[in-house]
Amino acid sequence: MLFRSIGTDHAKVPSPAELAAAQKLVGWQKLELNEEKQAVRLQDKGMGVDLGGIAKGFAVDEVRKIYAKYGIENGLINLGGSSLYALGVNKEQAAWRIGIRHPRKEDAQEKMAVLPLKDAALSTSGDYERFFEAGGVRYHHILDPRTGRPAQSGAISVTIVADSSVPDGGMLTDLLTTAVFVLGPEQGIHFLQTMPHGIKGAIVDGRYQLWTTGDMAKELEDVSKDFQFWQGSGELQ
């Protein structure tokens, strides 16, 4: 896994030869699942499986099941801010107010916007979480399987919400943020519009434009003046 060093002091850009060799090992078709034995086989030597794109979301769903088992009706299941579930209401008997991080501020407390949330899962992915820069290029941890390189799709942050009607919403939103980030704003929005009812999202592009689906544009509060909503018609609001 050539970009595993991203976010460490020894991060480096792989050579074209290293990338070409690694690309030959990419593909879900090379993953064999044996449900009876609960086993997985990787067809080629050197392959690996990285569950980073779904692990937090899966954990959120499992904690939610534990809450349900013990009759807990209100609470915030928060795995580091990037994957969470807002259950019921907060101590003020109001929706939980979830801050979405500004993708270009070093201080993680700087928010792009706030989203009131109740009985819904939320995940956010961005190119600011783990990255290094070399030659004026930002190399981040969200890889495009088609190139083997960090995705250069025009997106810098993606937030997806799934309400309680969506099964395994934590894992699904975790997965979708990565997929939509790789697709980029235009393709990502079209893809989200094909999703079942109960799923909505917001994509931030490199020009600080917010592309949204569902009623996200109306629900986002305290939006930073750095950002504008993209209307899809070529005009900004």
State the predicted function of each range.
Residues 1-237:
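Mature catalytic core of soluble alpha/beta enzymes
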